Amino acid sequence: MRESVHTNTSIWSKGMMSVIAAQFLSAFGDNALLFATLALLKAQFYPDWSQPILQMVFVGAYILFAPFVGQVADSFAKGRVMMFANGLKLLGAASICFGFNPFVGYTLVGIGAAAYSPAKYGILGELTTGDKLVKANGLMEASTIAAILLGSVAGGVLADWHVIAALVACALAYAGAVVANLFIPKLAAARPGQSWHLRKMVRSFFCACISLWRNGETRFSLVGTSLFWGAGVTLRFLLVLWVPVALGITDNATPTYLNAMVAIGIVVGAGAAAKLVTLETVARCMPAGILIGVVVLIFSLQHALLPAYALLTLIGVLGGFFVVPLNALLQERGKKSVGAGNAIAVQNLGENSAMLLMLGLYSLAVLVGIPVVAIGIGFGGLFALAIAALWIWQRRQM
């Protein structure tokens, strides 16, 4: 990894482009692996309710390691942390390729992802600052969503052809991410010399949680992003069961195409947010959050492919516009109070706790036999109400 002692505030710097390239390949692998592993579960006749369990073991790793990964990201050069994390993802994908239990392999990928996330977002605040950070987040989200778009489709299409080939492609993507990490400049550790005593680390993490929760802006950001990503991952699994029921299509590729429409929309929404929203005008994103739930409700009632594509694209546009400013707000305020790595680790705890809760409720709803269309309607309505309540709460705190 190359040595560097200076940060470059341009969002088009060589260091930033290396981060974006590594993120693209890592996210490509994450999304292709999800759909390839779902295809593997289907081929091995696992029950439908086990599908969200796969994601639950992934997010469980985030929650379990949340007290530690923020300090890891702030105690070492973040580029090296990203490289180590991608190596863990590579190991997990390779283990599934070689026939190990897919839930165990996917848990390894989850551990790698847990370590990766605080570093990948925390490094943005070290490479650029101020309102450029919103633009850098937009670039990161656009890269991530492009990877979701291509990775999801690649995972589904390759799995329809050959499941093992799809899994190998995922492992190669992670290997490419490790190589890209080598070109990220080595920046000084943000907070070196912290205690590695486990009890102190847990106490320090929960002190960071309390600090961020007591601040009105960071509390608002934490709740908003947690609701968004919890809903987003649940929508992914909802589509897997919704497609054969509503559209009568039973392949692996169609749900990935529909997920790709959301990804395309998020790229557009993230770009719009970077241009129209600053750290001082974050509240502009809230109407978009409410509309996400409304459009999900309308989408659940569709029975044709074309309107489904259009509505999912709109959901993505609204989602990108909603989440990018909230991410930037948390990074900027969190960097000044508890460190960027710890701020993102706390955010991950909130987001993944929301994912675990929503996926658990979704899995339970499927297990007890609630029709998938009814699940979608209830899910959309509750999300719209939750974001509306958050907006009212935030305005009363001002």
UniProtKB/Swiss-Prot annotation:
The chain crosses the membrane at residues 19-39, 53-73, 91-111, 139-159, 164-184, 227-247, 257-277, 281-301, 304-324, 350-370, 372-392. Coiled coil: none annotated. InterPro entries: LysoPLipid__transptr_LplT, MFS, MFS_trans_sf. One of its GO terms (molecular function) is lysophospholipid:sodium symporter activity. Gene3D superfamilies: MFS general substrate transporter like domains. SUPFAM superfamilies: MFS general substrate transporter (SSF103473). Belongs to the major facilitator superfamily. LplT (TC 2.A.1.42) family. Catalyzes the facilitated diffusion of 2-acyl-glycero-3-phosphoethanolamine (2-acyl-GPE) into the cell. PANTHER family: MACROLIDE-EFFLUX PROTEIN, MAJOR FACILITATOR SUPERFAMILY (MFS) PROFILE DOMAIN-CONTAINING PROTEIN. HAMAP family: MFS_LplT. This is Lysophospholipid transporter LplT. The gene is lplT.
